[in-house]
Amino acid sequence: MSETLGYIHSVETFGLVDGPGVRYIIFLQGCAMRCQYCHNPETWAFTKDTAKTPQEAFNAAYRYRNYWRNNGGLTISGGELLQMDFVSEVFRLAHAKKVQTALDTSAQPFAPDDAEWMARFDKLLENTDLVILDLKEIDDEKHKKLTGHSNKNILAMAQYVAARGVHLWIRHVLVPGLTDDADGLRQLDSFIKALPTVRRVEILPYHTLGLFKWQNLGIPYPLDGVRVPTAEEIAAAEQLLHVQDYPDAPKD
């Protein structure tokens, strides 16, 4: 049987935000979501021109282990659950070397009614220390408009991961006029509070740093003219989500 391959978009060798400590981050190719504020639309297509074996991908990361110290490690992001078997094997290799692992995911491919898929996902979770999950919008209809997909399986994955005892970091992108209404944030707060393994909640302010990528790809940018949130709006959202109540909250 041929070895599982992973299709990698890019890597970051000294990441400081996608998990605890210093991280080596592998960004995989392929994503079914079409988030209106996506800053990496070039990763949507499932291209196969950058194939690596799990051992090759892990070996490239492990060269940077001296930077990780006690709390850093390896994060895999991008179209990760579309390449679940590859990620599972990379994380198995990482745990064999006592490397901390984090899965940064949109959770869109989560398939709780597919027994074979869930068996593979359980195998992945066995070697996953942290799941970083983007909860983009708590209202399902608004979520469909924002991303092109329902959030039902995404919320179900959050609950499943928490029930398995895996630590969670939750992120929410704050877009003025779209994802910032107080009632929606309160509902999101209630959902997150019911997840017993959440260690951190983050507000990610909307930005336009990826706008040029949409332009280069010839894709109309759906949020043209939308402003970035103010510091006051960010602080208000952080209060509504009680971000300082969680164990891994950044210390001032």
Across the structure, where does each feature detected by a protein language model lie?
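Short, conserved loop/turn and helix-capping segments at secondary-structure boundaries
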Residues: 51, 148-151, 228-231
